[in-house]
Amino acid sequence: MRELGRRLAKLLRAGDLVMLSGELGAGKTTLTRGLGEGLGVRGAVTSPTFVIARVHPSLGDGPPLVHVDAYRLSGGLDEMEDLDLDVSLSDSVIVVEWGEGKVEELTEDRLRLRIDRAVGDTADEVRHVTVTGLGERWATADVSVLAG
Amino acid sequence: MADSRDEPLVLGIETSCDETGVGVVRGTTLLADAVASSVDEHARFGGVVPEVASRAHLEAMVPTIDRALKEAGVSARDLDGIAVTAGPGLAGALLVGVSAAKAYAYALGKPLYGVNHLASHICVDQLEHGALPEPTMALLVSGGHSSLLLSTDITSDVRPLGATIDDAAGEAFDKIARVLNLGFPGGPVIDRYAREGDPNAIAFPRGLTGPRDAAYDFSFSGLKTAVARWIEAKRAAGEEVPVRDVSASFQEAVVDVLTRKAVRACKDEGVDHLMIGGGVAANSRLRALAQERCEAAGIRLRVPRPKLCTDNGAMVAALGAEMVARNRAASDWDLSADSSLPVTEPHVPGQGHPHGHPHGHDHVHEVSKENLYS
């Protein structure tokens, strides 16, 4: 997951929205940690559940990473301004966990990653990731680099 | 009585998350602790939107300040300072408290102290058990934080020894309660079910406890996944999920790691006191196991009463009073809310006013010699 996040970092640029879905414990935050490393942003990427959203500024001249957990948000986010973030979203890479049905209105273009893990009490640590690019931004992008 | 009257009288404002807290203390004596549950249980269940929390703080702010002053039986004019949480927390929510604190401080002609939320969680114990021993080892566990901190002086030196690398302890409780359909917040309800369950029924993993793992860091994500999977397997097999045993075994895994690492940190650093703060400190099993292990290791345990462990204004006032007592520099009028204020900064001193400057306050409110409030 972490390595996938690092590879994902190479594909992303300011203004991109990534939506992560998957069961509790699928590895959404772990993937985001790799993404943060790949983007070279400040701070440890930990679960944003409690604070809803956390901004990780770039350590270089790249875009900041905005890590959102939409689980506790009651309704849809008509405007991300509701999150009270002090960064411009068009200048940032945004990753949203649990955002289905809540943040689609933000942009037509988004990259969707669905992480599936084995269900039940098993030692099976394999994760299956389904990547779907939506909108013009991703129509021509080559996501095959994610396969490594 | 004469002695206590000499101690600093400070009002503290806390708005880092979704409780509007205002406390008044004199030195290490609690005079008032007013909390407005700005977002009621129903709304919390549906979820929290930061912007909504900020608005709720705004509405609750002035009434809660008035209530705290009334409860304390003091006049705003008698205050020696106004303290406020400057961070970390939700940016918009913090801003409401900081703005209110500035307005009151300026109008009253009192020094302003922007302080750290985490250091406040430690300092609040002075209201319960008297002056903090120096050094103090602190285990802070809440919905947003899980940290081991060592402080030799709560106003100037707080050192992080370890923290969670993924989920906070309280968050793990909330998420497991979610999987078990027990509602939000998860801590109290899991605590309740766990009392009737067997903590050894299921061997859930203890994160980061291997010999090569970081000695003082925590990880609760793997535990969360293991518990979720165990429950899924039961459900898939059509069996009933033993909620009491799952709660007890999960809770045991969390508090086992927390207390084990905290006691180890005390031993390694040669500290004979451990304080536990933050919302999870209200957990009965954490208190019991910490007591047991501290006694065995010859460490004195200090845990404030539950109401002082969760977010409140009294803890901010307690740290503010300590800042005044130790002559720490007041904050400038351009103090800003810092959502990611590092734990190593117990307060935000004004520029050009070094720590311990004996006349720090006077410079800061030169602009407001007139008391606009009276």
From Swiss-Prot, chain A:
Q: Keywords of this protein's UniProt record, alphabetized? A: ATP-binding, Cytoplasm, Magnesium, Metal-binding, Nucleotide-binding, tRNA processing
User: Any signal peptide, and if so, which residues?
Assistant: none
The biological process GO terms on file are: tRNA threonylcarbamoyladenosine modification
* Recorded GO CC terms: cytoplasm
Among the GO molecular function terms of this UniProt record, one is: ATP binding
Q: Which SUPFAM superfamilies match?
A: P-loop containing nucleoside triphosphate hydrolases
In terms of domain of life, where is this protein from?
Bacteria
Query: Where, in this chain's numbering, is Mg(2+) bound?
Result: 29, 97
Does the record carry Metal-binding as a key word? yes
Q: Which residues bind ATP?
A: 25-30, 125
Compartments it resides in: Cytoplasm
Checking Pfam families in the record gives:
TsaE
State the function annotated in the UniProt record.
Required for the formation of a threonylcarbamoyl group on adenosine at position 37 (t(6)A37) in tRNAs that read codons beginning with adenine. Is involved in the transfer of the threonylcarbamoyl moiety of threonylcarbamoyl-AMP (TC-AMP) to the N6 group of A37, together with TsaD and TsaB. TsaE seems to play an indirect role in the t(6)A biosynthesis pathway, possibly in regulating the core enzymatic function of TsaD.
User: Into which family does the record put it?
Assistant: Belongs to the TsaE family.
Give the protein's recorded name. Answer: tRNA threonylcarbamoyladenosine biosynthesis protein TsaE
Give the organism the record lists. Answer: Streptomyces coelicolor (strain ATCC BAA-471 / A3(2) / M145)
Highest lineage ranks of the organism? Bacteria, Bacillati, Actinomycetota, Actinomycetes, Kitasatosporales
From Swiss-Prot, chain B:
Keyword Iron listed: yes
Q: EC number(s) in its UniProt entry?
A: 2.3.1.234
Entry's cofactor comment: Binds 1 Fe(2+) ion per subunit.
Which keywords does UniProt give here? Acyltransferase, Cytoplasm, Iron, Metal-binding, Transferase, tRNA processing
Q: Where does Fe cation bind?
A: 117, 121, 311
Extract the ranges annotated as region (Disordered): 337-374
Citing just one GO molecular function, the answer is: iron ion binding
Q: Where is the composition biased (Low complexity)?
A: 337-352
Q: Which PANTHER family match?
A: TRNA N6-ADENOSINE THREONYLCARBAMOYLTRANSFERASE (PTHR11735), TRNA N6-ADENOSINE THREONYLCARBAMOYLTRANSFERASE, MITOCHONDRIAL (PTHR11735:SF6)
- What is the stated purpose of this protein? Required for the formation of a threonylcarbamoyl group on adenosine at position 37 (t(6)A37) in tRNAs that read codons beginning with adenine. Is involved in the transfer of the threonylcarbamoyl moiety of threonylcarbamoyl-AMP (TC-AMP) to the N6 group of A37, together with TsaE and TsaB. TsaD likely plays a direct catalytic role in this reaction.
Which protein are we looking at?
tRNA N6-adenosine threonylcarbamoyltransferase
Q: Which gene encodes it?
A: tsaD
